[in-house]
UniProtKB/Swiss-Prot annotation:
PROSITE patterns with a match to the protein in the record: DICER_DSRBF, HELICASE_ATP_BIND_1, HELICASE_CTER, RNASE_3_1, RNASE_3_2
Function statement: Required for G1 arrest and mating in response to nitrogen starvation. Ago1 regulation of cytokinesis and cell cycle checkpoints occurs downstream of dcr1. Required, indirectly, for regulated hyperphosphorylation of cdc2. Has a role in the RNA interference (RNAi) pathway which is important for heterochromatin formation, accurate chromosome segregation, centromere cohesion and telomere function during mitosis and meiosis. Digests double-stranded RNA (dsRNA) producing 21 to 23 bp dsRNAs, so-called interfering RNAs (siRNA). Required for both post-transcriptional and transcriptional gene silencing. Required for silencing at the centromeres and for initiation of transcriptionally silent heterochromatin at the mating type locus. Promotes histone H3 'Lys-10' methylation necessary for centromere function.
Positions of short motif DECH box: 145-148
Lineage summary: Eukaryota, Fungi, Dikarya, Ascomycota, Taphrinomycotina
Phenotype for residue 1348 to A: Decreases location in the nucleus. Abolishes retention in the nucleus
Name this protein carries in UniProt: Protein Dicer
Effect of residue 1344 to A: Decreases location in the nucleus. Abolishes retention in the nucleus
Gene from which this protein is expressed: dcr1
Start and end residues of each Helicase C-terminal domain: 340-517
Length: 1374
């Protein structure tokens, strides 16, 4: 393949061709001014490697390699990738940002296969190499854009040192070629000439390259420097007045972390630009924090108190100020005085007015230092609506150090495009546009803020590329000195580069060996090539600590402790949090503290790799992520419940095995109990089987006509003798009754081991089969229909035919048309007329739910002359029974499948319960596995929790969750079901009466009407069968039976069949042995409260140790593992109660009821009732505040319990209280030898404290209801506000008096300047809840304080804070 024709026709200039000839043959560092075509040369080199790769692949000489274009800014990824795509037919990949955190091995493996070139940020590429997803051997070219950044620990330097030079050292051993290196820069260094020589030499060593400098003389014929001049402005700075919005906010909100940076930003803008600019910052930040709040709430995240405070206070300040100074049309017009607008801004404005007075074709870039400056300058020009000026800001995407101004990558790209096309002609940019970004050629470049380095100066000046362009620098007298220093350094740089151009001065330099800034200690993972260094090890340890189980009150991080060492040397020991249970590691000595810490971190990472806690790609084993991956996999496999697979149905052995010479048989009598009128009298049937029949209870049938029918099977224990004559008679009877009930002809394909016959109602001797069978009726089956001779022939149970050839069009006699025709007729024209109702061809008695609600077709009633009618020698009662037969056989078959299922897996459950467990909703019966699946799921969670708790006793909580998830996940249950061939027992096929056919028969009318041997099942349905089967055994036979089926199915629990066998895997006496020397003084109080005495007191102590206590000496464990198991135990106790309490509740309803009892708020309240919060061992001041806050709210709202019995359900509760309760329940469970009986106190405690879950009513959001109600009344002057009250308190000690400042949040609802409802608390959420409860009380009482009529439809102005009057407890912020 020749790709040369694809390259856009860009002829290289002479200097470019010279560079290309060199760079195509050797590693090269190119130093050339901005805009001279460095990127074009890089693309030419990529094209060369692409052509070589094509030839190599065609010859099958080497595996595929790719080219890498490295950049140091994300916008450059988009820019360079787009340019390469426009020039080459290569497949170009873009990689940037945080993709590395969750980068999968599969994705990165596909890079080589999918792309020819990748454009990637340097830091991310380093991680690709460090984690072994790519290697130097996979590359043929590495391009370093702006390579002058390769200093110190920069990613460029680390890539070369850690991977390129390491690969070069073993090049001869591994037999591979190194990639070509091409570095590009316009500003290699700042400072003295000697320093430049030294730095270039170091770069040559680092990049294994030769530097090539293109001097300005070589470029003189192609480029000209812009005209450079200065604009001097006054040094006078603006001091914000004391009554300004910025000063007031600075004084009042100085403690709010959220806006501390905003204060700095606004003040900086005010001082440098003017008061108007500072005001715009505040307006922007108010919108920002409100957007941040809404986003957090949309994601279900809780706002911190500081964030809530900042939002509410800022809104109050700025809203009032905005109402006074702003119109509805936008920002106020700035005043051109020395306060509102500084001299610097004024001179910029005058300059732009002069430039754009006559034309808008000039392109201008204004470089500023701060993002906020770019934002406000752009807004300033738009507010003034200057003619011919279309300004827009261009800033970076990352968070600012001083404010939350940012621009997404897409907006950056869009802004540049609009600047290129002329929609914008003034671009106000930060440093993001100085270097590398392809800003179009500009006529005017303005440095609004001074350059701090030569690089900044050269790069920004390089943006002025148009002919006759200008470069203006704004300076005051102090900045002029700085600029002169920059010019001097730039002069040295130009002189040095001129000397270096086309010279070999490097060869004469004596320089130290290549600078190495990375570690000498490294570890390479042989399987992946991932490389661990000391520098990477430190961040890896912090990442590992972030994966540990913790709550908001606990933070984990590695601890470095200095160890004794020789003078001038340092040595450190690193210790991970005790929750890891990993021993400390000591590093080798080093001459710097930083290097010594890296050595210790390196040794610890090696230990973690050996333990399997860091994987082969140097990624910490994050069980939270592994759980999420499992859930994602499960969701991907199960998300489409419409995805189904076909499985063979199990056919009962009783249906298939037919003895060759049958002499004995078994009999069941089929009765019904629906006898509402003659229409629903059913003739009893004899059900004869070749095999003994399992005991089956009665079952209910239902259809769209008539009442429900209860089928009773009376099985006779003794077998009966049968001969060939009687057997032949039964076969004929069976076929006739089936045809009679289905109204179609049947052909028997294979013999069946069951037969049907009408019961002899006059039989008194049940010892012989021939006595039970109504032989006379069977013989009548085969008689021809006889015409009606007389009206006396017509009876209520007579089945009539109009056409003797159409035996399935049957009618029932209903009466005569006129009573005068009750005498015999001698002539046809005088024959009486009979009213006849057409009988159904077939009936489905397995209709439930929506199918049973369908309106049946009305039975047609017609009149016939009796002489035209024929009598079928079968009673209408038998016809009714025949219509039942398909549904009876359908149900019996399902029960036989369930019986075989029980027999195969040796289960201890009833047949009807097993049948329910195997029946899905698709069968459309009056029962399915829904409830049993819920029941079994709860037991499986308990069993899996105990299993992983016992198998992994020293692992963190996340790992327990992960290992449990592997057992209880639907993916695992699906695999279990497939391995056990469980799908064949599924009962998911509904009875479709039109197409149903009994086993062994086929309808003569259609080949499609055969016995169904296949069924379609979804993956989720199959997984649910496992849990439903467990639930069936648990329901009928208890815990041991449930364990046995788990063992039979091999779901992953420990190999036990008896509940007491859990104790074989648990040593009560040695558990929590690390606490043997730690005292817990509250044991007796807790035992007295719960009424249980512990054998192992350490278990009880462990249940009350919060993770924050693990910083204490002698504490090496916490309650997290106990809380994990206690959660499952408590779930099971509650579900046991709910399942039996509400037998008609669906699984969804049961889940809601369970959530009411076991949610965090309910459990925290129970823990509070038991006073558990008083005994929690912790080291967190925040936890003390949370406990105090929670206790205050509970005690306050207990007084209003009659109005809202479930008040605690609305309070934001501390999770550690609920965790402690679950841990304590687990401690009792373990201490009692896994006995659920020991927890009998739990259920009464929950029911008495929480009440009945079914009585709770969701009242909706009260605030929303009130808002809507007042809006409907036409009121416009209402709303909510949050204020803060700081209460000072003192505490006397022996030495002095300590002052404390406590913050309280006040949430108020106001109407027309008056506070209607008010809530006060230490937490914003709880203050709002209190306010809502008082608002609800007013609404329920229909209080005039809330609901009075008003006339404010024409008044839109809201009251100020001064107008809102409280009760003296709340002060307005203003």
């Amino acid at each position: 393949m020749d790709i040369s024709s694809f390259l856009l026709p860009q002829l290289l200039r002479k200097y470019q061709q010279d560079v290309y000839n060199i760079a195509s043959k050797q590693n090269t560092l190119l130093v050339m001014r901005t805009g001279a075509g460095k990127t074009l040369l890089a693309v030419k080199l990529i094209k060369q490697k692409l052509e070589e790769q094509i030839l190599i692949q065609e010859s099958n000489l080497e595996h595929k390699k790719i080219s890498v274009f490295l950049v140091n800014k994300v916008p450059l990824v988009f820019q360079q990738a787009e340019y390469i795509r426009s020039q080459l037919p290569a497949k170009v990949g873009m990689f940037y940002g945080e993709l590395s955190i969750e980068m999968s091995e599969q994705l990165l493996t596909n890079i080589i296969l999918k792309y020819n070139v990748i454009v990637i940020t340097a830091d991310l590429f380093y991680l690709f190499l460090a984690r072994g997803f790519l290697s130097i051997n996979d590359l043929n070219l590495i391009i370093f854009d702006e390579c002058h950044h390769a200093i110190g620990n920069d990613a460029y330097a680390r890539i070369m040192n850690d991977f390129y030079h390491r690969a070069k050292a073993v090049l001869s051993k591994k037999h591979f070629t190194l990639p070509r290196i091409f570095g590009m820069t316009a500003s290699p260094f700042t400072g003295k000439k000697g320093n430049l020589y030294h730095r270039l030499y170091q770069w040559e060593q680092l990049f294994d390259s030769k530097a090539h400098v293109v001097s300005e003389n070589e470029l003189a014929d192609y480029f000209c420097l812009p005209e450079e001049s200065y604009v001097m402005y006054s040094n006078k700075l603006v001091v914000p007045p004391s009554d300004s919005i910025i000063k007031k906010c600075e004084e009042t909100l100085q403690g709010c972390k959220l806006i501390s940076r905003a204060v700095k930003t606004a003040l900086a803008e005010t001082i440098d630009m003017g008061l108007w600019f500072g005001e715009q910052v505040w307006l922007y930040l108010v919108d920002f924090v409100e957007t941040k709040r809404l986003k957090k709430k949309a994601l279900g995240k809780q706002l911190s108190d500081d964030e809530e405070l900042a939002i509410d206070r800022l809104k109050i300040f700025v809203e009032d100020w905005k109402n006074n100074k702003y119109s509805d049309n936008g920002p106020r017009i700035p005043v051109f005085d020395s306060t509102d607008v500084t001299d610097k801004v004024f001179k910029l404005l005058e300059l732009l007015k002069a430039t754009y007075r006559k034309s808008d074709s000039v392109r201008t870039v204004i470089f500023v230092e701060r993002k906020a400056t770019a934002f406000t300058l752009s807004l300033f020009m738009k507010t003034l609506n200057l003619p011919n000026i279309r300004a827009h800001s261009f800033i970076g995407h990352g968070p600012s150090d001083q404010g939350e101004f940012s621009m997404t990558f897409r907006r950056q790209k869009d802004t540049l495009h609009k600047f290129k096309t002329g929609k914008y002609n003034v671009l106000i940019a930060t440093a993001v546009a100085e270097e590398g970004i392809d800003v179009p050629s500009c006529n005017l470049v303005i440095r609004f803020n001074i350059c701090r380095t030569v690089t900044q100066y050269v790069q920004s000046r390089g943006r002025a590329r148009a002919m006759a362009s200008k470069f203006l620098i704004f300076l005051n007298t102090e900045e002029l000195l700085i600029h002169e220093r920059i010019l001097h350094e730039e002069k040295n740089l130009k002189f040095a580069l001129s000397e270096l151009s086309n010279s070999n001065i490097f060869d004469s330099l004596v320089c130290e060996e290549r600078e190495r800034v990375t570690d000498d200690i490294v570890y390479e993972v042989g399987e992946t090539g991932a490389l661990l260094t000391g520098l990477y090890a430190v961040s890896l340890l912090y990442n590992f600590c972030n994966t540990l189980s913790r709550d908001v009150y606990t933070r984990y991080y590695p601890t470095f402790t200095a160890q004794p060492c020789l003078s001038g040397w340092y040595c450190f020991e690193v210790e991970l949090p005790k929750a890891c249970k990993v021993p400390a590691a000591q590093g080798s000595p080093a001459k710097s503290i930083r290097k010594a810490k890296q050595n210790a971190a390196f040794i610890m990472c090696l230990d973690l790799i050996r333990m399997g806690l860091i994987d082969k790609h140097l990624k910490p084993l994050d069980f939270r992520r592994k759980i999420a991956d499992l859930e994602t996999l499960e969701e991907d496999e199960l998300k489409d419940e419409g995805y189904i697979e076909t499985y063979e149905r199990y056919v009962p052995k009783s249906w298939m095995k037919v003895p060759e010479d049958i002499t004995r048989c078994f009999v069941s009598l089929l009765y019904t109990d629906a006898n509402e009128g003659d229409n629903h009298i059913f003739h009893p049937l004899v059900f004869v089987q070749a095999h003994s029949f399992p005991k089956i209870d009665s079952f209910i049938l239902n259809s769209t006509v008539g009442p429900r029918v209860k089928i009773v099977l009376e099985t006779i224990e003794d077998s009966f003798k049968i001969d060939s004559h009687l057997l032949e008679l039964l076969k004929k009877s069976t076929r006739y009754l089936l045809q009679f009930g289905l109204s179609t002809s049947l052909e028997q394909q294979i013999p069946t081991p069951y037969w049907l016959a009408p019961l002899n109602l006059s039989c008194t001797d049940y010892r012989f089969l021939e006595n039970l069978i109504d032989v006379d009726t069977i013989q009548n089956f085969f008689k021809l229909p006889e015409p009606v001779q007389n009206v006396t022939d017509l009876q209520s149970d007579t089945v009539l035919l109009v056409n003797p050839q159409s035996i399935y069009e049957q009618y029932a006699f209903e009466g005569f048309v006129n009573s005068e025709f009750m005498i015999p007729a001698k002539k046809k024209d005088k024959a009486p007329s009979a009213l006849c109702k057409k009988l159904p061809l077939r009936l489905n008695y397995s209709l439930w739910g929506n199918r049973a609600k369908s309106i049946p077709k009305s039975q047609q009633v017609r009149s016939f002359y009796i002489n035209d009618l024929y009598i079928l020698p079968v009673s209408r009662h038998l016809k009714n029974s025949a219509l039942l037969i398909p549904s009876i056989l359908y149900h019996i078959e399902n029960l036989l499948v369930a019986s075989s299922f029980i027999e195969h897996f040796r289960l201890d459950c009833k047949i009807d319960t097993a049948c329910q467990a195997l029946t899905s909703a698709e069968s459309q019966l009056n029962f399915d596995y829904d409830r049993l699946e819920f029941y079994g799921d709860c037991f499986l969670k308990l069993g899996a929790s105990i299993t992983v708790f016992l198998k992994f006793p020293d692992t963190q909580e996340y790992q327990l969750h992960f290992n449990r998830k592997k057992i209880i996940s639907n993916c695992n249950l699906y695999k279990v079901a497939i391995d056990c061939e469980l799908p064949k027992y599924a009962l998911s096929t509904p009875l479709e009466i039109r197409h149903w056919c009994p086993y062994g028969f086929q309808k003569s009318t259609s080949d499609k009407c055969r016995y169904a041997v296949l069924q379609k099942l979804s993956v989720k349905r199959i997984a649910d069968m496992v849990e439903a089967s467990i639930g069936a055994c648990l329901l009928d036979s208890g815990l041991d039976s449930a364990l046995k089926i788990c063992k039979s199915l091999s779901v992953g629990l420990l190999d036990i069949s008896n509940w007491d066998e859990w104790n074989n895997y648990f040593d009560l006496n040695t558990y929590a042995d690390s606490l043997r020397n730690v005292q817990f003084p509250y044991s007796s109080y807790i035992e007295e409260t719960i009424g249980y005495s512990f054998k192992n007191k350490k278990l009880l102590h462990l249940a009350f140790i919060h993770p924050s206590m693990m910083s204490q000496q002698g504490i090496y464990e916490n309650y997290q593992q106990l809380e994990f198991l206690g959660d499952a135990v408590l779930d099971y106790i509650i579900v046991q109660y709910l399942y039996k309490k509400y037998p008609n509740a669906t699984s969804g309803e049961l889940t809601d009821y369970k959530s009411f009892y076991v949610c965090n708020k309910s459990l925290s309240y129970i823990g509070f009732v038991l006073n558990l919060h008083k005994y929690i061992q912790h080291e967190s001041a925040a936890m003390c505040d949370a406990i105090f806050e929670y206790q205050e709210l509970i005690e306050a709202f207990r007084e209003t319990a009659s109005e809202n019995p479930w008040f605690w359900f609305e309070i934001d509760s501390p999770k550690f209280i609920s965790d402690t309760l679950e841990a304590m329940i687990c401690a009792i469970f373990l201490d009692s030898g896994f006995s659920l009986q020991s927890l009998q106190f739990v259920l009464p405690l929950f029911l008495n404290s929480l009440g009945d879950a079914t009585h709770t009513k969701a009242k909706g959001d009260i605030e929303h209801k009130v808002y809507q109600l007042l809006k409907d009344q036409g009121c416009e002057d209402f709303g909510t506000k949050c204020v803060i009250e700081e209460v000072k308190s003192s505490h006397k000690t022996l030495l002095n008096t300590e002052l404390h400042l406590t913050k309280y949040y006040g949430f108020s609802f106001f109407r027309h300047g008056n506070i209607v409802a008010y809530g006060k608390s230490r937490k914003v959420a709880n203050a709002k809840y209190i306010m809502k409860q008082r608002l609800l009380k007013l609404l329920e009482d229909k209080s005039n304080l809330l609901l009075y009529s008003c006339n404010c439809k024409f008044s839109k102005k809201k009251p100020s804070d001064e107008q809102i009057k409280g009760d003296g407890k709340v002060k307005s912020l203003t």
